Amino acid sequence: MKILKSLVLLVLFMAMPAKADDAFSWMSTSFGGLKSLFGCLEVPEFTSFQEGNIGISLSTAGIWQSTGNTVQKGKLLKINWSTSGITLEPRKYLVLYRIDPRFSMPQVFIKTYNYSKLQFEALGFPRFVTDNNSETPGTIPPDKDLDALSFTKMSDFVKYFNYSNGNSRIEVKAGDVVNISLVGKDNFFSPNTLKLPNTVDNILTQELDSSIFAASALYTQSNLGDFDNRIIYSSAEQVCNMIDKERKSVCSGTGTATKYKNTDNGVIVGKPMITGAVQYFMGLIKACPANAGINTSPACYYDQGRGMIIKVGGQVIKGQDQSFVNSGSTQSSFIYYQATSGGIMDFTSDWQVSNMFSNSVLMNDWSRNFSNYASFVDYINKNDWSANFLYFGCYSMIVEIGNGANLINPDDQQNIKLEYLITSDGTLPDPSVRGMPVDYNFATDAPQDGYLWLRVVNPNSNIQGVVSVNYANYTGTTWFSDIIYNGAIKPITDQFRTFSQNFYIKLVKNSAVQNLAKTALTLYVTIFGLMFVTGALKLTAVEVITRICKIAIVAFLIREESWSFFNTYFFSAFTDGIDFFVTNVVGATSSRSNIFGFIDPIFDKYTNGRIWGLLFIELLQIHNGLAFIAIITIYSLITYFRAILEVIIGYVIAFIGVTVMISLAPFFIILMLFEKTKSLFDNWISTLLSYVVQPTILLIFFLLIDQVLSEQLLKVVVRACWDTLIPIKIGLDLTNLGIPIHFSFTLPFLPGIPFYVPDVPEISSSNILTNNANTFLVLFTTALLFYSYCLMSYSLVTFVNIVVGMLTNVTPARISGNYQERSDPVGAVMQDIDSVTKPIKKAAMAPARVFKDKIIDQNYKARKAEVGGEFTNKFLAERNDVKKEEGEKKE
């Protein structure tokens, strides 16, 4: 009775408690109001692990990110992370496309973005020797003549623009997405292109221009003033008709013989006009119409990329007359292209710059024809540089190339590190605080209680994206595994490890064993020599190596360092192999250091107070059969707990078997020398292997069944709501006595005994075939399935013994018996446990039998025996309605 009261109190405590101010308000609540007060008991979810995930952006590298999880000391902390969301940063280039009459093709200045330095750099650009000791480091020394310096570098300039000096070009791969946008000329020399200190001698950190005219120097200005990204291609006649129609200042001649004259020879470096003339001329002309050809009349300018051809691997992606797409929202012009094949990106034009002047103006010719600076200056000053047509201008572009499908470089991936940190409070840790490194599949026991923090460190600057991190920590109890492993199993295994080592060392040091080994070696070598001399043995390389190895192993066996050698390179594979396989097979565990930590989540599930409370509620439903389902479930759980005990015992027996076999290793190792005794050595190896494989296979089957059991248990247990458990109805019926009196009534203050009632609908024609998880039919079939799976787990040891025997060919049999059954040490241990607990089981079942006899069957008067009299022998242990002879037969 006390147990029953305790269970009722347990169920009531599981209900939602009332507020402190309303602790006694239920006393004045009506019977119907109690239902809303106590509510329902829901089926619990098995949440022994607190899981979560977080995406950490590489842009926040080095900064600690909160997971929101709290961990407990000594319990499992598991972290898995992936770099699948990491991609390469788009390759960025600044490109200056400029028309210069001294080069047969347009000049293309390329600057590559360096993510490490966060700046654009002109790689391979021919640079001058600069004076870093001056007040403005990086400038040309004032005592040097720019023109004289540039004359000696003309060949370098030619090589640079012809890409013959190894300078980098823009490479596009198949599948790359290319975006080219027009930008202002100032972007090419943007602030993120640092001048100091990283690019001290990189003269492309500022405009290439000089107040002194130098025909052999490079320039980046096209003398269009504020009119960026425009190209002029017009005959001298069209230009002169606008700016010097009377041919009085900068023009001469008429018709096709018209020439444009320039007093400072700036035209030969792409600067045909002074600033004032440019402003005047650009104010007179307009943009050329769409699809306008070369040398349009009247003179006009080309914009939006017209006049420039862009190719990738020889394939044109933007034609001469094609314009960039104008974005109305961003007011920018761009071209978007996905490469179908790879190659080098070229910026070129079909418009020819040759014949602009009557004399040779190509820098390539100058570098070959002039050996000294004086003759070159004389050539420039004496010749007439009047232009037959004007072709000048520039485009400034930014090129971005990316491909989400491209894998990041292995070096970049290896540089990405993840760290975790546990703090006692939720305050954001300082970035200078170092954390613990985390592998891709990381598991450990939390070193302390606290909050979990994660961060990414050391990513390379050329990658971007998010590191995806999944984390989980165990929140359940660990008392069972602590008792089983730390309190029982670990002391046993440690003792047997020590026993195995001591026994082995004593055996090896024993003079009889040493003499046996020496005698065996002597016989082996003698027999081998005689067989070889008489020709009875065909000697091969494999045979020689095999025999030498055998001799070396046995010879090393009797040395003092025998245990250290064999334990390190051989025995540890078996002693540590069991723990290794068990640890790697187990998925969910409470502790990394406790190999039986996987039992804690299982016990958390099957010892959950809510589960047993709902089962007790079902036990009270005798009238509708739910009590039978609850009894099946409880008995199944007890059977399953026994199966868990078998797994534990199986592990211990396997480990003991391994240590015993290892302690006898010297005998079996000696036996491998001779063919007649080698079978004993082979069987010894097979036995060791079987002891390692058996607990592993047993655990695999056990965990698979546990997954199914968890699902079935949640279907057997149903929610329970506060309702009338036993209705109280008072009535009187005298019609059977001929008195016409028949009435019944309920007490308004107590219509029934209230308690939790399972929420299960009655079986009807409408739901008998539906897949409703709460129908009696579904509950009954699920309970039978649950019972079947528990019985299956109970029989796993026998089944695994058969499987391991077939795999390792180790099938020890009894000496006698028709079938020579395989011995089962685990089964023998369980039978001993049964025999010890049998009286307890009988004592527990006796009240149940009495309850069935007196309450359910209403057998108040026991049946009489055939000889007369009432049989009442062993009232609490035997049924009174069964004859003594029948009872003995059943036993």
Swiss-Prot record:
Membrane-related topology note: Multi-pass membrane protein
Keyword Ligase: no
Swiss-Prot/TrEMBL keywords: Cell membrane, Membrane, Signal, Transmembrane, Transmembrane helix
Record-linked InterPro entries: Conjugal_tfr_TrbL/VirB6
Leader sequence residues: 1-20
Family matches, as Pfam families: TrbL
Cellular compartments per GO CC: plasma membrane
Main subcellular location of this protein, as a coarse class: membrane
Localization: Cell membrane
Methyltransferase keyword on record: no
Family: Belongs to the TrbL/VirB6 family.
The name this protein goes by in its record: Uncharacterized protein RC0145
Source organism of the structure: Rickettsia conorii (strain ATCC VR-613 / Malish 7)
